[in-house]
């Protein structure tokens, strides 16, 4: 009888590949992502954006100057060619999410590393940049109680982990006035874990089953960009930009483990009675999405900048895990800007940068015949700190809030209402820049 019930448990487990968002309750766990949608693809994508850019909706392709100064824009490496000072930029990230499904809700919160980047000018040769950025996060936990005749069981799924990207980039001005190009060479690395469990909490005679899948992702990637800068007179300027990626492939070392524990309680807390480990697959390749972004910004000196981006990413070549629907195309738009009331004013609040933006994305995920959309408004401040070294050092504290929603309660899906807080710090200085004496 136990063998028959064990086969029942495994058949329930193996039938749950795509049940994820059909579960009646969703809960988050301690990761940097609290999204049930992060189980698809490589997780919830973080993008190569600073808090300054996020507060302006995520504009990136055409962003070259901000507040009259060159900005470190990893999303378009052509911008490195504009740097005239060494730039350090780092941040932390916080997330507050309300998950809703049907009439039930759950609240989560977490804080994590944002990014750390450096930019160094190389005089007429252009500029280079290097750093470490988060690439994606996985973090979800959901369960459903069901009956099989008189037998009651709980089916649950959970995942955690994330990918990071270390990069080195170079941008250079071309002989054609105003035109620049650049590229980033990156190394992607990290671990993603997904777990499916079937538990029989009220029956100690039936074994609980756990299936754990680990993905170890490693590999090199390349992205590139181009910008055209033009002065419009009266201290106004315009930058048109494009950035994209190649058909990057990275390696996926995949391993699976099946575990049997005693019933009558939590499978994760019980002692394992038996374990089956599958051989590690070393030769799997993951196709990263092909991306194309175009954007434009218009600026007036230190006073203001406005911009817009169109973003496209094709995930249809991404190999999904067994039981999951194929991914599609991610299409998005971003609008935003920055305003400084009076750069020469002695009043402090007149020299603060005020930022506002909005974005809308049709994501690559379609579930229950409905596209999952993501939309948000954002706002932030660039708070200047005291200048030192006779005006050669400019430091700024960047605070950004994103207020958005992903998904919907319709079509039996999960709705996420979230607040993302980004706290960043920027230093512009003359490190590594050789001075001259007249």
What are these regions (language model features)?
Residues 29-438:
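Subset of outer-membrane beta-barrel
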Residues 1-40, 432-438:
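Cleavable N-terminal export/targeting peptides
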């Amino acid at each position: 009888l136990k063998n028959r019930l064990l086969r029942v448990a495994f058949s329930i487990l193996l039938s749950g590949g795509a049940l994820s968002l059909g579960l009646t309750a969703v809960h988050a766990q301690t990761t940097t992502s609290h999204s049930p949608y992060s189980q698809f693809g490589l997780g919830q994508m973080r993008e190569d954006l600073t808090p300054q850019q996020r507060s302006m909706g995520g504009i990136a392709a055409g962003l070259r100057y901000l507040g009259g100064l060159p900005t470190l824009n990893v999303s378009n490496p052509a911008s490195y060619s504009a740097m005239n000072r060494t730039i350090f930029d780092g941040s932390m990230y916080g997330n507050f999410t309300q998950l809703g499904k049907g009439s039930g809700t759950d609240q989560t919160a977490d804080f994590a590393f944002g990014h750390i980047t450096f930019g160094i000018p190389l005089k007429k040769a252009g500029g280079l940049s290097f750093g470490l950025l988060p690439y994606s996060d996985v973090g979800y936990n959901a369960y459903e109680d069901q009956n099989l005749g008189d037998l009651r069981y709980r089916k649950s799924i959970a995942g955690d982990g994330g990918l990071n990207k270390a990069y080195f980039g170079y941008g250079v001005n071309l002989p054609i006035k105003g035109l620049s190009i650049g590229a980033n060479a990156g190394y992607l690395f990290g671990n993603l874990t997904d777990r499916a469990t079937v538990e029989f909490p009220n029956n100690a005679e039936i074994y609980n089953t756990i299936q754990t899948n680990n993905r170890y992702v490693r590999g090199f990637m390349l992205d590139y960009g181009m910008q055209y800068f033009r002065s419009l007179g009266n201290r106004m300027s315009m930058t048109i930009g494009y950035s994209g990626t190649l058909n990057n492939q990275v390696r996926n070392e995949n391993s699976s483990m099946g575990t049997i524990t005693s019933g009558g309680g939590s499978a994760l807390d019980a002692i394992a009675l038996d374990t089956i480990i599958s051989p590690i697959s070393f030769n799997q390749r993951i196709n990263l999405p092909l991306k194309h972004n175009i954007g434009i910004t218009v600026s007036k000196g230190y006073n203001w900048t406005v911009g817009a981006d169109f973003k496209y990413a094709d995930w249809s070549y991404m190999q999904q895990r067994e039981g999951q629907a194929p991914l599609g195309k991610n299409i998005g738009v971003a609008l935003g800007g920055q305003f400084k009331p009076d750069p020469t004013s002695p009043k402090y609040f007149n020299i603060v940068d005020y930022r506002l933006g909005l974005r809308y994305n049709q994501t690559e995920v379609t579930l229950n015949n409905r596209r999952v959309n993501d939309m948000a408004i954002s706002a932030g401040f660039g708070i200047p700190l005291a200048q030192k070294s006779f005006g050669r050092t400019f430091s700024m504290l960047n605070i950004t809030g994103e207020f958005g929603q992903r998904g919907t309660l319709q079509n039996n899906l999960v709705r996420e209402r979230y607040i993302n807080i980004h706290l960043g710090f920027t230093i512009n200085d003359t490190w590594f820049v050789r001075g001259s004496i007249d």
